[in-house]
Amino acid sequence: MKYFLTVIIVSIFLLQCQTKKEDGQSGQYQVAGSIERLDPSISKIIPKDASLEILASGFSWSEGPLWIPELKALVFSDIPENSVYKWTESDSIQLYLKPSGYTGDTEKEKREPGSNGLILDKENRLILCQHGDRQIGRMKSELNNPLPKYEVVVENYNGLRFNSPNDIVMNSMGEFFFTDPPYGLDEWNIKELDFQGVYKITTGGEVILLIDSLSRPNGIGLSPDEKTLYVAVSDPKGAKYYSYTMDEEGRIVNGKMILDVTNMISKDRKGVPDGLAVHSSGNLFATGPGGVLVISPDGKHLGTILTGQATANCTFNEDESALYITADMHLMRLQL
């Protein structure tokens, strides 16, 4: 009876998550939100007739979207559910990985156990920021045959365990940059590092600390020329975006705050700076109060994709014809 009820519950959940298959085939989805245009230049990137579509709903907290060209699919994390889901135009939502972040056998319920940021490495393998296991992990199986078996990429800095790796980006050399705030920790006393870091992983597997001065480093991205690293700080008392100039070896030369949105946070504009994606134009699509802020490289706020939800992250497909957005319970898309 318990198994039967579990099957029913899971089936209902997946049905709630799905937009009807026939709707996906016709391209007709529920439209939500709006586009706030503060500078005319935003219309060069976001068409004037663009609308925000809800592709699927019913998630606990959607995060870490990643477009996989090989599968013509988007995968994304649901952190509280310790799962990764896959969305395609033809089949809508399917469970892709579970567990995705915490792989232990303890029955203790973890606050944020799942994976967060996702990325493909140079060998086209799935890399996961794993909150629950406090590591950067790599899925052992092929993308078209996913199995929840992982190997450790990195799990500590100078012998001290990471807090809970959050978001990740890769440069053309195959080096990773990632953030490590404390959101995945259930108890503060298990924290081993006395700071929240931004790190680089070299192709040889060396972990280099780049930044240790930010209260809540979260979203991360690289400029198209890979000379600038962008970091979003999800501290409601200091909700800011930073840019850092890097030398040829990928080390920080100098940094500055480019936009402070602390005063934008309100009941009408939910959310703090979280994940971000950098467009080929150099502009940032950075989640924050109200939805996804479009920000120029020098920090000018060009406009906002207003989602109506606290918004966690976003990513482009391979030709930047669509922006996929994870916003609380929703998976959304803006066609560009």
Locations of the language-model features?
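Sec-dependent signal peptide recognition
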Residues: 2-8
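C-terminal motif of bacterial Sec signal peptides marking the signal peptidase cleavage site
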Residues: 14-16
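Sequence-structural signature of mature extracellular/luminal beta-sheet repeat domains
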Residues: 18-336
